[in-house]
Amino acid sequence: NGSHANLKVIGLSSGRQVQGIDTRVTNYGNNSVGHILQHGVILERGTLTFNGIGHIVKGAKGADAQQESRVLMLSDKARSDANPILLIDENEVTAGHAASIGQVDPEDMYYLMSRGLDQETAERLVIRGFLGAVITEIPVKEVRDEMISVTDTKLNKR
C-alpha cells in the first residue's frame, strides 16, 4: 500500500534501426502510484514503437496510473507508434494517458538557425531538449550522466 513506481524511458532510433519498447506498471496496493514517462527521437529511416501498459488490479483503491509517450521524428521517412494501454479493474482510481508523435516545428529550426546555428547543431539542441525533459527526471546522477553520454555518442555517429 502506498508504493510508487516511476519509469523513465528514452529511445533514439537512427539509420534503419527498428526499436520496440514495452513498459508495464501494475498497481497492486491501495494508494499506489505507477507512472510511465517515455520520449523518443527518430532520425533517418528509423522506427520506434512505445507500448505502455498501466494496470490497476481489483482492490487497489485510490491507485494512480499515468502514462505519457512522446515521439519526435526528424525525417519524413521515420516511422513511429505510441500505444498507451490502461487496464482498470477497480472503480475508485485515477488513470490517464497522453501520446503524441510529431516533427520539429520548422519555425523553431528557423529561429535557431537565424541565431547562427547550422542545421545539425540546431537539431542536436532540439533533441537534447526533448530528451532532457525525461533525463532530468532521473533521480540518480550516475544514471542521468550515462543517458546523456549514450545519447551524445549516438548523435555523434550521424
Regions found by a protein language model. Name each.
Residues 111-116, 121-132:
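Extended amphipathic alpha-helical segments enriched in small hydrophobics
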Residues 1-110, 114-117, 138, 142-158:
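Conserved beta-strand/loop scaffold segments within soluble protein domains that form the structured core
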Residues 130-140:
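Short arginine-rich
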